[in-house]
Curated annotation (Swiss-Prot):
Top-level taxon in the UniProt lineage: Bacteria
Free-text function comment from the UniProt entry: Probably functions as a FAD-dependent oxidoreductase, whose physiological substrate is unknown. Does not display amino-acid oxidase or glycerol-3-phosphate dehydrogenase activities. Is essential for growth of P.aeruginosa in the sputum of cystic fibrosis patients.
Enzyme Commission number(s) of this protein: 1.-.-.-
Cofactor info, note text: Binds 1 FAD per subunit.
PANTHER family cross-referenced by the UniProt entry: GLYCINE OXIDASE (PTHR13847:SF289), SARCOSINE DEHYDROGENASE-RELATED (PTHR13847)
UniProt xrefs under Pfam families: DAO (PF01266)
Disruption phenotype: Cells lacking this gene show growth defect in natural and synthetic cystic fibrosis sputum.
Protein name as catalogued: Probable FAD-dependent oxidoreductase PA4991
Length: 391
């Protein structure tokens, strides 16, 4: 029988939210164990575009919303971690771009200008022209306008690698997770037959929270899934582009990020409105055809004749909302010794950790003495989606 363990905080779910929380708690002196059933970052995290949103895209058609205000400070907090004064040490993690951009095709430039003239938005953006344009927009055929946002874009696989480093010896690969009770109280979890006692158990497993709650005999908090149908384009002719393209609706028409591949080429990863409801309803062939049409209209000077195409379906797991709306903040619920949450967005991982740390403080949960952990089976790092799709 595997050796029983004792720790302060037991975390289930090794995506960026769980790994970030784990690193924050360890830095604060807590003993932790983080359990992952598959690969680190392999759920939603590694399928993220890596944009640390500051909320500009949520304010595209009117006043700043709750969503844009809640998320406004996130780029500053993440950027601080790349230096010496952040809440975590992410020095050396690869940034794909120092800025994300917003561009409008010719016909919509006027509405974009008036939007960015508003006082609420002015401090977050600046117009880009000439050599300051993203390389993919530096063409005489580009007739629109582009604005540089104060949002950074991380290489997500490299971010996951660094957060796994910060976890030290606290990571545990474990598939079968059952409640460990003392009387009626949750005392910890039994992971593949190994008892792990903890002062608090945190579920941060994204879509996996639903099954974990069921295993613990709980129906609340309820979860919703908002699906996406993303598109990947691989070609030697691609130029770097990290940008939202403005459409007529409240969501970006298309959101493009550029990712290096192991064979020295690049992949454009396409989200935004194309990946939402209509895109979800399309099969792979129809979704690729739609992406081809959109890129031919928006960026006709980019040669995609030899490009490879693939799609990827992703479920965004979140606390249930009325009308399947997008939650504005990270979410955390408490039931006795159990904390359950979703960051709801990559950029809000620090907000999720804030909420857990605040709850521990309120409940008087302090770091305590525990025996050193033995060598534990360690979960692997997730493979980037494009390396799998274009293998």
């Amino acid at each position: 029988m595997p050796q029983a363990l004792s720790t302060d905080i037991l975390i289930v779910g090794g995506g960026i939210a769980g790994l970030w929380l784990n690193a924050r708690l360890r830095r604060a002196g807590y003993a932790t164990v983080l359990v992952e059933s598959a690969s680190l970052g392999g759920g939603q995290s590694v399928k993220s575009q890596g944009i640390i949103h500051g909320g500009a895209k949520y304010a595209l058609h009117g006043a700043l919303t709750g969503a844009s205000e809640a998320i406004a400070d996130m780029p500053r907090r993440w950027r601080a971690c790349l230096g010496s004064d952040g809440e975590l040490d992410l020095r050396g993690v690869r940034l794909l771009s120092e800025a994300h951009y917003l561009w409008s095709p010719g016909g919509l430039a006027g509405s974009l200008t008036s939007f960015f003239a508003s006082k609420a938005v002015r401090s977050r953006v600046e117009q880009a022209k000439g050599e300051d344009l993203p390389p993919a927009l530096r063409d005489k055929g580009f007739k629109g306008k582009a604005y540089r946002l104060t949002e950074i874009v991380f290489d997500v696989p490299d971010l996951i690698r660094r957060l796994a480093e910060l976890a030290g010896d606290s990571l545990l690969a474990g598939e079968r997770i059952e409640p460990l009770r003392e009387g009626r109280e949750l005392a910890g979890l039994c992971v593949d037959g190994r008892e792990i006692r903890a002062q608090r158990v945190v579920l941060s497993a994204g879509a996996g929270n639903e099954a974990l709650l069921r295993e613990l005999g709980l129906e609340q908090p309820a979860m919703q899934r908002r699906p996406l149908h993303m598109v990947m384009v691989k070609a030697a002719t691609l130029k770097p582009l990290y940008a939202h393209c403005l459409g007529a609706g409240p969501k970006p028409r298309i959101t493009v990020t550029t990712h290096p591949t192991r064979d020295g080429q690049s992949v454009w990863y396409l989200g935004g409105d194309i990946a939402e409801t209509d895109g979800v309803a399309r099969d792979e062939a129809a979704q690729i055809a739609e992406a081809r049409r959109e890129l031919a209209k928006l960026l006709p000077w980019i040669d995609l004749g030899q490009a490879q195409w693939a799609t990827l379906r992703v479920d965004r797991a979140e606390p249930a909302q009325s009308n399947l709306l997008r939650p504005d903040n990270a979410f955390l619920a408490e039931q006795g010794r159990l904390l359950v949450g979703w960051p709801t967005k990559l950029a809000l991982a620090p907000d999720f950790a804030d909420r857990v740390c605040a709850r521990l403080e309120e409940d008087g949960i302090r770091p305590s003495e525990h025996a050193a952990l033995p060598q534990l089976p360690r979960p692997p790092l997730a493979e980037p989606a494009w390396e799998v799709a274009f293998a």
